């Protein structure tokens, strides 16, 4: 085998170190810095000739800097004769701009996919894309992992008396249904109307939640406005408790204030993005899952088998 190396972008150093610890391999050395005008400079500090290389870099805030850094690292590795380059992107930025939702707007998720390929990325490994069709924006393999396995273990450890799964909106029904099926639980739907960006008005509950411990499932939590309003609606319908599982803890704007003052009892997120500690937030690591996927990709083994 050619051997492989793992490098970290500045947004995911701790995440990459955890992956390397699981795989018992050293983290690759790269000198990443910024010039005084903000331009990013990258130098790969060890040979990668003929190696399969994995770059670990989430492209959350600051999204533009982290995305550009990933592309520049890719170019540096390509010019250093790496055999293949896999972008391990725990959080795929710009995924919410996946279609023309209004006149004269871009499809930025597709533009970003084009940039990945143009830079020289051969494969992408990510988790819980906001829209599954983004995989079709690429002409290279894309492994979209599911955070549900990690949430499943944690929820089982809670020994909830009467659990039920909820989708926080109509668009998330497929994700919630998949989770409910894995857990062997029933499902309800929170029906809401989004009036404008980062604001949501909960309209009603489809299904019975009285006396249930409700578990909302979503791909991300941003300002937490949707989650908190949904929790209020669920409790108004008689839910005993409400927790939410969201793979990506974006947690921008008034997110922490919303959580502090809202009816949501617990928010469970993963470490695809860094987050500030909060009494209502539980952070679960998905680095071991990514480590196993990296191992399987390198050895040409099935990734899908992890989720069957």
Model regions and ranges:
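PRPP-associated nucleotide enzymes
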Residues: 1-308
């Amino acid at each position: 085998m050619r051997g492989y190396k793992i490098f970290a972008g500045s947004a995911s150093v701790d995440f990459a170190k955890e992956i390397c610890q699981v795989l018992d391999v050293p983290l690759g050395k790269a000198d990443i810095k910024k010039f005084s005008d903000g331009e990013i400079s990258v130098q790969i500090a060890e040979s990668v000739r003929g190696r399969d290389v994995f770059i670990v870099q989430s492209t959350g805030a600051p999204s533009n800097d982290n995305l550009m850094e990933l592309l520049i690292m890719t170019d540096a590795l390509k010019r250093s004769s790496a055999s293949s380059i896999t972008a391990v992107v725990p959080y795929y930025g710009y995924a919410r701009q996946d279609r023309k939702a209004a006149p004269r707007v871009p499809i930025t998720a597709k533009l970003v996919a084009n940039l990945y390929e143009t830079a020289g990325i051969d494969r992408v490994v990510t988790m819980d894309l906001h829209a599954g069709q983004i995989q079709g924006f690429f002409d290279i393999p894309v492994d979209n992992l599911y955070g549900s396995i990690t949430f499943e273990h944690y929820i089982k450890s809670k020994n909830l008396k009467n659990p039920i799964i909820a989708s926080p909106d109509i668009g998330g029904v497929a994700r919630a249904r998949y989770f409910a099926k894995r857990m062997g639980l029933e499902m309800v739907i929170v029906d809401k109307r989004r009036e404008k960006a980062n604001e949501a008005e909960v309209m009603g509950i489809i299904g019975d939640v009285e006396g249930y411990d409700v578990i909302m499932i979503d791909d991300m939590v941003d300002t937490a406005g949707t989650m908190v309003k949904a929790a209020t609606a669920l409790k108004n319908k008689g839910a005993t408790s409400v927790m939410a599982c969201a793979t990506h803890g974006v947690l921008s704007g008034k997110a922490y204030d919303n959580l502090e003052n809202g009816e949501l009892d617990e928010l469970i997120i993963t470490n695809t993005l860094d987050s500030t500690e909060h009494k209502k937030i539980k952070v679960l690591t998905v680095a071991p899952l990514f480590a196993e996927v990296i191992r399987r990709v390198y050895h040409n083994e099935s990734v899908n088998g992890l989720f069957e």
